[in-house]
């Protein structure tokens, strides 16, 4: 299971989650867009 660190891009819809308790900040929820780990 690979995870993204702070500052990296994330996309829960593609299974790209942030590491640990880092949140995936997305500009909007729909349509799904890549976010940034913060």
UniProtKB/Swiss-Prot annotation:
This is Trypsin inhibitor 2. Coiled coil: none annotated. GO terms for molecular function: serine-type endopeptidase inhibitor activity. Contains disulfide bonds. Inhibits trypsin-like proteases from the guts of the insect pests P.truncatus, P.americana, Acheta sp and Gryllus sp. Optimum pH is 8.0. Alkaline pH values decrease the thermostability of this inhibitor. Thermostable. 10% inactivation is seen after incubation at 95 degrees Celsius for 2 hours at pH 9.0. Retains activity after incubation at 120 degrees Celsius for 1 hour at pH 3.0 and pH 7.0, but at pH 9.0 40% of the activity is lost. The modification Pyrrolidone carboxylic acid is found at residue 1.
């Amino acid at each position: 299971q690979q995870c993204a660190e702070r500052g990296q891009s994330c996309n829960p819809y593609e299974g790209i989650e942030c590491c640990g308790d880092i949140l995936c900040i997305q500009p909007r929820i729909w349509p799904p867009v890549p976010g940034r780990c913060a």
